[in-house]
Amino acid sequence: MTAPSQVLKIRRPDDWHLHLRDGDMLKTVVPYSSEIYARAIVMPNLAPPVTTVDAAIAYRQRILAAVPAGHNFTPLMTCYLTDSLDPDELERGFQQGVFTAAKLYPANATTNSSHGVTSTAAIMPVLERMEKIGMPLLVHGEVTHADIDIFDREARFIDTVMEPLRKQLPGLKVVFEHITTKDAADYVREGNDQLAATITPQHLMFNRNHMLVGGIRPHLYCLPILKRNVHQQALRELVASGFERVFLGTDSAPHARHRKEASCGCAGCFNAPTALGSYATVFEEMNALQHLEAFCSLNGPKFYGLPVNDSFIELERRESQVPDNIALNDDSLIPFLAGETIHWSVKK
């Protein structure tokens, strides 16, 4: 017998950390997000990065042009912080409603981050202006010194960058993005209402054993890298507790298959097609489905000072299979959980 399906109705969610890329990749991946999410914080790490108001407006138009008819989707644009960024340009974009937030990438921490910030001291006038105008700072929280082990880079960032910065600018709103460690979970939980975090589905579902034992799985390779089981469990416990300053941020980061399955493969999981069902699975496993809506749809708007969405979606508990690949010109994209059976899907 087939068990009766379970349906969860939740307010329409937002994705507070999303990579849409550009060109043909943009046109391919946008519908997977615009179908489900009402809004998304769009990352600015293009080549060249989005560092001006005009560049953000142009990129927003390219995104909107890729949204299928019938989808209601608002991209929330971000400014890529560099050592040479003009605080006046940043403020102009924020006051005009072009920039929702600004993104701090430590130089060379992740994809297309070579233009990133060399030190917070180098951009202190920009950060002081952000504190003054109430503009959120989104942080990729890893140090990038060559002598720091890749598994330690997030924890080290808290001690050497994040905590000193928040002490120096106590009024600055900070989102600690895609946290991956118990250290970060504890830090955010113990922080004040100026500090929040996003968590990806892959960091809730998997740890480094899943990526490395029995063969290397390049489609689980992302940055920050998957950590030990103890860190995965800390993240799961944080979201299952109903903690209000943590919210959905998929960090969906598409790369063509040949760039993932390579001798020097790219970091990033393309999880937009399966993320929401993945989150539901985790919350169900943790007996915390009562907190799923807040994580997906309420906590983010509250932190950003934005209204919650008026519309609703339904998640259905039924088994379905994730496609093995998604066509991309003469290549393909491998979605997160490709070929696997998933238990929650958005009801069409």
Swiss-Prot record:
<feature type="binding site">
    <location>
        <position position="140"/>
    </location>
    <ligand>
        <name>Zn(2+) 2</name>
    </ligand>
</feature>
<dbReference type="Pfam" id="PF01979">
    <property type="entry name" value="Amidohydro_1"/>
</dbReference>
<feature type="active site">
    <location>
        <position position="251"/>
    </location>
</feature>
<keyword id="KW-0862">Zinc</keyword>
<dbReference type="GO" id="GO:0008270">
    <property type="term" value="F:zinc ion binding"/>
</dbReference>
<protein>
    <recommendedName>
        <fullName>Dihydroorotase</fullName>
        <ecNumber>3.5.2.3</ecNumber>
    </recommendedName>
</protein>
<feature type="binding site">
    <location>
        <position position="251"/>
    </location>
    <ligand>
        <name>Zn(2+) 1</name>
    </ligand>
</feature>
<dbReference type="GO" id="GO:0044205">
    <property type="term" value="P:'de novo' UMP biosynthetic process"/>
</dbReference>
<feature type="binding site">
    <location>
        <position position="45"/>
    </location>
    <ligand>
        <name>substrate</name>
    </ligand>
</feature>
<keyword id="KW-0378">Hydrolase</keyword>
<dbReference type="InterPro" id="IPR032466">
    <property type="entry name" value="Metal_Hydrolase"/>
</dbReference>
<feature type="binding site">
    <location>
        <begin position="19"/>
        <end position="21"/>
    </location>
    <ligand>
        <name>substrate</name>
    </ligand>
</feature>
<feature type="binding site">
    <location>
        <position position="140"/>
    </location>
    <ligand>
        <name>substrate</name>
    </ligand>
</feature>
<dbReference type="GO" id="GO:0005829">
    <property type="term" value="C:cytosol"/>
</dbReference>
<feature type="binding site">
    <location>
        <position position="19"/>
    </location>
    <ligand>
        <name>Zn(2+) 1</name>
    </ligand>
</feature>
<comment type="similarity">
    <text>Belongs to the metallo-dependent hydrolases superfamily. DHOase family. Class II DHOase subfamily.</text>
</comment>
<comment type="function">
    <text>Catalyzes the reversible cyclization of carbamoyl aspartate to dihydroorotate.</text>
</comment>
<keyword id="KW-0479">Metal-binding</keyword>
<feature type="binding site">
    <location>
        <position position="255"/>
    </location>
    <ligand>
        <name>substrate</name>
    </ligand>
</feature>
<feature type="binding site" description="via carbamate group">
    <location>
        <position position="103"/>
    </location>
    <ligand>
        <name>Zn(2+) 1</name>
    </ligand>
</feature>
<dbReference type="InterPro" id="IPR002195">
    <property type="entry name" value="Dihydroorotase_CS"/>
</dbReference>
<feature type="binding site" description="via carbamate group">
    <location>
        <position position="103"/>
    </location>
    <ligand>
        <name>Zn(2+) 2</name>
    </ligand>
</feature>
<comment type="subunit">
    <text>Homodimer.</text>
</comment>
<feature type="binding site">
    <location>
        <position position="17"/>
    </location>
    <ligand>
        <name>Zn(2+) 1</name>
    </ligand>
</feature>
<comment type="pathway">
    <text>Pyrimidine metabolism; UMP biosynthesis via de novo pathway; (S)-dihydroorotate from bicarbonate: step 3/3.</text>
</comment>
<dbReference type="GO" id="GO:0006207">
    <property type="term" value="P:'de novo' pyrimidine nucleobase biosynthetic process"/>
</dbReference>
<dbReference type="InterPro" id="IPR004721">
    <property type="entry name" value="DHOdimr"/>
</dbReference>
<feature type="binding site">
    <location>
        <position position="178"/>
    </location>
    <ligand>
        <name>Zn(2+) 2</name>
    </ligand>
</feature>
<feature type="modified residue" description="N6-carboxylysine">
    <location>
        <position position="103"/>
    </location>
</feature>
<keyword id="KW-0665">Pyrimidine biosynthesis</keyword>
<dbReference type="InterPro" id="IPR006680">
    <property type="entry name" value="Amidohydro-rel"/>
</dbReference>
<feature type="binding site">
    <location>
        <position position="267"/>
    </location>
    <ligand>
        <name>substrate</name>
    </ligand>
</feature>
<dbReference type="GO" id="GO:0004151">
    <property type="term" value="F:dihydroorotase activity"/>
</dbReference>
<feature type="binding site">
    <location>
        <position position="223"/>
    </location>
    <ligand>
        <name>substrate</name>
    </ligand>
</feature>
